């Protein structure tokens, strides 16, 4: 029998509903407001006793009033999964928001629905891989390589290029990699979502991407759950035996939505005002993003860093779950070097001679040691000038500046801004070029020739024109 209740209190996105004491809904159950004018789903967060449950609205509570009838659907929020979602934009509840009509399977078979709250795969079901996933972005492939089935975080403050880097990764991997991708926009700008849709359409990869959006203007409950909707779609593809790419932009907004919900529910805040359940909420999401014996989920997550402070509880909690961290630096962006990835602050578990091989490992560490030494010499250069350096250090500084410029790269998705055609650089060419710079093969070339190019052949060609 369907349990019905009525709304007794509305405070913003929090709605209290009273049920009969013998039919109180379970935690996380979906409730539906029965009204012709209002289509609203609520999710149970707390049982307050005396048959009253406290819920969070998944949409706007405008027009709600006390006394409205609410139905317990008897299950968690369910969303459509499978190939019907490819090339479409859906919201947290699985409803289409791209004005292209309802979702349907190509063979007109019945849509499959999965609940968004699911258990993470057991230890026995999980599988790990050490296969490297080539991205075509020089600095990433060299310094912080991605693994197939791994988790990657793009860390950066406001406006240093997290979304552009993510769009380039999707474009490169989705074109080179034949599998499916799921893009989940959590609390980001609607304009970015629109740009992204058109970018995928122009790159002709839209039919391989499922888009799930919960933008900045949505209520906190919606932004808190939209990541689970995207993840559930990715899990379905993985369980069909596919290798899936899951992109989440932005994990910080997921944390922030949790903070808002926590405050609305009256919980005592912890450090810096975050929710006391921050680590648990992050774990609930991250533990499900994993590879099994059936298929893999490789995830790339943008992480906004408040005030460029990597020790803030939100990015700090995310660090623990990642295999590779790509750190974007405002100082590098200020030099006009894009992508503004900091090679000294970015790390990867895959950068191990047993996984990537000795040549790759030695080249990456050689690049880092030269850049580190250049960093140390910067103060001396600023105070005393280049003339006070030893001959050895002068050569090192020259190579470091070439490396720094050669780590820049024109992106396909940023062609309209940079005016340079995008470049995809293979790992083999990448290692060969940096090995040559470290070894002094290109000491005679001017450093300007290394800026905004792809391969070392382009540098040589550009140097002849200078």
From Swiss-Prot:
Its EC number is 7.1.2.2. It catalyses: ATP + H2O + 4 H(+)(in) = ADP + phosphate + 5 H(+)(out). Keywords: ATP synthesis, ATP-binding, Cell membrane, CF(1), Hydrogen ion transport, Ion transport, Membrane, Nucleotide-binding, Translocase, Transport. Coiled coil: none annotated. It comes from the Bacteria. GO terms for molecular function: ATP binding; ATP hydrolysis activity; proton-transporting ATP synthase activity, rotational mechanism. It is a peripheral membrane protein. PROSITE patterns: ATPASE_ALPHA_BETA. ATP binds at residues 156-163. SUPFAM superfamilies: C-terminal domain of alpha and beta subunits of F1 ATP synthase, N-terminal domain of alpha and beta subunits of F1 ATP synthase, P-loop containing nucleoside triphosphate hydrolases. It is found in: Cell membrane. It holds the Pfam family ATP-synt_VA_C. One of its GO terms (cellular component) is plasma membrane. Its main location: membrane. InterPro entries: AAA+_ATPase (IPR003593), ATP-synt_VA_C (IPR055190), ATP_synth_F1_bsu (IPR005722), ATPase_a/bsu_AS (IPR020003), ATPase_alpha/beta_chains (IPR050053), ATPase_F1/V1/A1_a/bsu_N (IPR004100), ATPase_F1/V1/A1_a/bsu_N_sf (IPR036121), ATPase_F1/V1/A1_a/bsu_nucl-bd (IPR000194). It is an enzyme of class 7 (translocase). PANTHER family: ATP SYNTHASE (PTHR15184), ATP SYNTHASE SUBUNIT BETA, MITOCHONDRIAL (PTHR15184:SF71). F-type ATPases have 2 components, CF(1) - the catalytic core - and CF(0) - the membrane proton channel. CF(1) has five subunits: alpha(3), beta(3), gamma(1), delta(1), epsilon(1). CF(0) has three main subunits: a(1), b(2) and c(9-12). The alpha and beta chains form an alternating ring which encloses part of the gamma chain. CF(1) is attached to CF(0) by a central stalk formed by the gamma and epsilon chains, while a peripheral stalk is formed by the delta and b chains. Produces ATP from ADP in the presence of a proton gradient across the membrane. The catalytic sites are hosted primarily by the beta subunits. Belongs to the ATPase alpha/beta chains family. This is ATP synthase subunit beta.
